[in-house]
Amino acid sequence: MGIKEDNWIRKMAIEEGMIEPFADNQVKVHPETGEKLISYGLSSYGYDLRISREFKVFTNIYNSLVDPKCFTEDALISIVDDVCIIPPNSFALARSVEYFRIPRNVLTVCIGKSTYARCGLIVNVTPFEPEWEGYVTIEISNTTPLPAKIYANEGIAQVLFFEGDSACDVSYADRQGKYQKQQGITVPFV
């Protein structure tokens, strides 16, 4: 199982629709305003995905316990904006701008960008399994004692693509995975 390079990622995105929309290079400056951005787009051995304007920020107003088997929407406040402020020692859920379609013989690993990590913000995304498709639900934890700002439509994490020696026997689509073809921010459910 080897990591895939920029040429392969570009070909799969353009010819197979693996990433939509697809930025064919590292975008570091806003094309219209000239403002510096947290980079996104194609890199040497990965793809830096962007975070959309949709956020769900955790609140403890209605809950005294976080239970992944019984997680309710009232534990989150929905926000649509160009930035999201995450309270100290809290977290937010968001989704990617890009829609992914993962081939049957590929597994991805997603790693948070160092720009945010160096500010005490941890990005967590589980692997995209073979034949999973959808918008990515992203979890961002603010480990600091201060509020933290996240910028929409800018880079948040890098996706690394690993191609297996052969296709798997049972893919995420075959077993009808519960997060298949998710369209928005999807909260946990069992």
Curated annotation (Swiss-Prot):
What positions constitute the catalytic site? 139 (proton donor/acceptor)
SUPFAM superfamilies registered for this protein in UniProt = dUTPase-like
Keyword vocabulary terms for this entry: Hydrolase, Nucleotide metabolism, Nucleotide-binding
Disulphide bridges, residue numbers: none
Give GO terms: molecular function aspect only.
dCTP deaminase activity; nucleotide binding
Q: Which GO terms describe its biological process?
A: dUMP biosynthetic process; dUTP biosynthetic process; nucleobase-containing small molecule interconversion
Q: Which residues bind dCTP?
A: 113-118, 158, 172, 181-182
Its EC number(s): 3.5.4.13
This protein's pathway: Pyrimidine metabolism; dUMP biosynthesis; dUMP from dCTP (dUTP route): step 1/2
Q: Which top EC class applies here?
A: hydrolase
Q: What is the catalytic activity of this protein? A: dCTP + H2O + H(+) = dUTP + NH4(+)
InterPro entries from the UniProt entry:
dCTP_deaminase, dUTPase-like_sf, dUTPase_trimeric
Matching PANTHER family: DCTP DEAMINASE
Task: Please describe the quaternary structure of this protein.
Answer: Homotrimer.
Q: What role does this protein play?
A: Catalyzes the deamination of dCTP to dUTP.
Q: Which family does it belong to?
A: Belongs to the dCTP deaminase family.
Q: What is this protein called?
A: dCTP deaminase
Q: What gene, per UniProt, encodes this protein?
A: dcd
